[in-house]
């Protein structure tokens, strides 16, 4: 597949205990279906050829011979397929029995990975039948007429990724084998399991898989036994899980009486980016325990260009579902804690905020109000200043006044019209020419007022600019770009809008709620150009630089994962397929890349402000970039889309 995606599957077949022929037929069918769907690697549950619950039947030579014959049958009937298959079976080695994962492709056995940790407590008695990989040196064994490497340290290299395998209990160990495999190069871990059910156990298993995939910065594909295993003492629900760096991509239906195939794509390019930037991961490589890895080469012949089955979130910064309340509260708590520390450190009891009636200044004012409450300071120490200019509309002006009044802050109104007119006269600028000088003069006049009032009152100017504006450079240098502490600098516009809406619907009186919801509904604008003949906003930011939901998506993929324009375009085309056509996405992606490079000089001298999410543009923290770097390569790729 393209752009670093590897399609994987967790198969959960119906089994008959000790009926290897039946089980082989089920496995063959699922391999064929998966191959037809473009799956590149598929894993089956633990001991899937025999069934996990054979117990003392594992000591029967007939069962072991039938298992080997079943493997031969499966390989013969799938040798024309490109897919790499991982199935579970008992393997005899040096007069001992290994609980093993057998990896094969096109009729060739690539390697055998034995289980390392054999549970022998409560309902588990695996040491009664099997021997641990710890008791065997890396060696070779004859299986199905082939000489095959056997080791828990096998890594399988494909043209697109590297994967390793652990088996069931291995994941439950304090230091799972997958940790070492990941440090040695495995980007995807496959786990074949036979986890029986118990009250609350499923959630615990999910947390283990999630945490291990996150800790290893890896994909994790988990397949556990399902219907058909013996229910003499326990029940198996058939759990299939696919995780990527802690995030669930796909899962099976529990307690299904039918076979299941859980399919998704692991973004190995994303995982590589995470590992490159995570210096702690790299530092651990030198301390990796265990024997050296043995690399086995494989091939992917399946080059079909298939669409993704995994979902691509169009608004990656915005919390979803049940996380909404918790995430919004956490965001406010971070902003409040950051501002509170600065106020305590400076012994400051006054802040000055420019209130435009727009989203950013609204959020900043709400943060100030909550911070003052937390510090037991009177809200009258918050000086909200509305500064109407040539483009101010009645809607934003009235919303600014209503918001400040409802929050109980000190209200000041200082028009910038006369001072700007005088300034235009001083510099010989024609007021009818609405160019960059006309616009930026107003922004700088407002900043001058805020700074001077702050000096008068011994206060701090609180910046309102957000992450999206910083990425695009949509701020006047030394105008609204500058403050004494910026509380919104790590929050993208899509999230600002969402937060304001959340505040409106949670804990605000009816009058304040109406004002906040109208602010959310107001077109985003700096209001530096006079309104239209009907008094409505004429200068709409998203008409000029593009939709913020697109730019926030571009920013997240570009900054968080280091993706190139072609991959960002590919992902955006999926995420916004019902909203924007590809030409529109290409247009705004090109503008994003151009402006991001052009406007770095503004980000190189940002005021202090708290980091809130995983993406930040602080020049002292997350993003250090020369102001004169060339965008040529990125723009060229945009042109070629």
Locate each region found by the language model.
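ATP/NTP-dependent adenylation/nucleotidyl-transfer catalytic domains that generate, transfer
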Residues: 6-7, 15-18, 23, 159, ...
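Enzyme catalytic cores with a strong preference for nitrogen-chemistry domains
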Residues: 1-352, 370-379, 411
